């Protein structure tokens, strides 16, 4: 398939290491980043990390802080109100997935650069030029701004709740399915397929898979491996110009569940469940994926996440409608109720 123009959006610099948050003013100097800054952060643990960042900014730096709890369009508007007031040179997103998504979308809408400073390795939005914002037409990722730089402090990331770390592993292993779906769409629909970006996404998944062997023994080494996999996955999306290499039928299932059960479940947890199910459909060894996830304490049953059997089955039957333009193993018609129930039981997602 011939593509007239292919735009690649990538970060300019990625900093990964231990206690590197204390060197933030050095990194900003290297990149020519100057105040005023608008710092977007959370209200609890992430606010404490933001305070550390503020302590290590250049002494004469001017900044404003806004705290958010969710990733909705209203949160984006709140950030934009402060943007108009402060007129910042750059936005700093210090937090988990929700904070970084709001920051990058606000940066995109206001033609500003932003720096991604993750406090948990929960999903690949750390790097990607796409954001998941509630309040838009559908629960899928929209075009946003790629980070100018990423500052990933392993000491900070290793202290994040284990549930968030596991969610990041689930999100990244899902790339195995995303790439299979992409290949299928290229073969059956003539969709553009990028070998290099697909390989990069698969490498991220393999790293996350390897991480399941390490994380229980050495949390810091495991988290470093995971954060590098998440960054690589985000880069793959930037190179592809879409979420295709990182989001397939496993994500469609996750988004479908989020419509039916919007609170209390992490995105990466749902992607992990979706990966097990879609691996079965693709003829991939789903049992190995399930066993590896289970060993790290990942919830591999719907009831572990407070989901009912009916919610899982319903999600499987509507998943293909979430992004009808994105062809996957689910096809155009999706799954019948009986097929969905059978698959969910065979893969032990429901009893």
Swiss-Prot record:
List residues binding Zn(2+): 171, 251, 267
Name the positions where NAD(+) binds.
97-101, 119-122, 128
E.C. number(s) listed in UniProt = 1.1.1.261
Which residues take part in binding substrate? Answer: 124, 171, 255
Q: Which UniProt keywords apply?
A: Cytoplasm, Lipid biosynthesis, Lipid metabolism, Metal-binding, NAD, NADP, Oxidoreductase, Phospholipid biosynthesis, Phospholipid metabolism, Zinc
Enumerate the Pfam families for this protein: Fe-ADH_2
The source's domain of life comes to: Archaea
Q: Cellular component per GO? A: cytoplasm
Q: Which GO terms describe its molecular function?
A: glycerol-1-phosphate dehydrogenase (NAD+) activity; glycerol-1-phosphate dehydrogenase (NADP+) activity; metal ion binding
Which pathway, metabolic or otherwise, does it act in? Membrane lipid metabolism; glycerophospholipid metabolism
Entry's localization field: Cytoplasm
Which GO biological process annotations does it have?
Answer: glycerophospholipid metabolic process; phospholipid biosynthetic process
Cofactors per UniProt? Zn(2+)
Q: List the disulfide bonds.
A: none
Q: What does the record say about how the cofactor binds?
A: Binds 1 zinc ion per subunit.
| Reactions performed catalytically | sn-glycerol 1-phosphate + NAD(+) = dihydroxyacetone phosphate + NADH + H(+); sn-glycerol 1-phosphate + NADP(+) = dihydroxyacetone phosphate + NADPH + H(+)
Record's subunit section: Homodimer.
Concerning its family, UniProt says:
Belongs to the glycerol-1-phosphate dehydrogenase family.
Its function?
Catalyzes the NAD(P)H-dependent reduction of dihydroxyacetonephosphate (DHAP or glycerone phosphate) to glycerol 1-phosphate (G1P). The G1P thus generated is used as the glycerophosphate backbone of phospholipids in the cellular membranes of Archaea.
Protein name according to UniProt: Glycerol-1-phosphate dehydrogenase [NAD(P)+]
Q: Source gene?
A: egsA
């Amino acid at each position: 398939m011939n593509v007239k123009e292919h735009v690649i959006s990538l970060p300019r610099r990625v900093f990964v290491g231990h206690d590197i948050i204390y060197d933030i003013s050095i990194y900003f100097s290297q990149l020519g980043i100057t105040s005023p800054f608008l710092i977007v952060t959370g209200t609890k643990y992430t606010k404490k990390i933001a305070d550390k960042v503020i302590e290590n900014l250049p002494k004469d730096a001017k900044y404003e802080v806004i705290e958010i709890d969710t990733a909705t369009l209203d949160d984006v508007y709140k950030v934009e109100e402060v943007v108009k007031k402060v007129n910042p040179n750059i936005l700093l997103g210090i937090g988990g997935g929700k904070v970084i998504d709001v920051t990058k979308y606000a940066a995109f809408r206001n033609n500003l650069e932003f720096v991604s400073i993750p406090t948990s390795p929960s999903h690949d939005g750390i790097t990607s030029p796409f954001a998941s914002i509630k309040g838009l037409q559908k629960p899928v990722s929209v075009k946003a701004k790629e980070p100018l730089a990423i500052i990933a402090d392993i000491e900070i990331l290793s202290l994040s709740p284990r549930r968030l770390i596991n969610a990041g592993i689930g999100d990244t292993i899902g790339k195995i399915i995303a790439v299979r779906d992409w290949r299928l769409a290229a073969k059956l629909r003539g969709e553009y397929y990028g070998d290099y970006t697909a390989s990069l996404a698969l490498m991220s998944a393999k790293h996350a898979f390897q991480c399941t062997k390490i994380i229980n023994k050495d949390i810091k080494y495991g988290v470093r491996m995971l954060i590098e996999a998440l960054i690589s996955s985000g880069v793959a999306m930037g190179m592809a110009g879409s979420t295709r290499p990182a989001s397939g039928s496993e994500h469609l299932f996750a988004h479908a569940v989020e419509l039916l059960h919007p609170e209390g479940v992490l995105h990466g947890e749902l992607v992990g469940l979706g990966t097990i199910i879609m691996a079965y459909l693709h003829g991939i060894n789903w049992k190995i994926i399930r066993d590896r996830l289970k060993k790290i304490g990942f919830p591999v049953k719907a009831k572990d996440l407070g989901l009912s059997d009916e919610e899982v089955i319903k999600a499987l039957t509507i998943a293909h409608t979430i992004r009808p333009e994105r062809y996957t193993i689910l096809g155009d018609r999706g799954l019948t109720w009986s097929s969905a129930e059978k698959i969910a039981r065979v893969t032990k997602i429901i009893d």
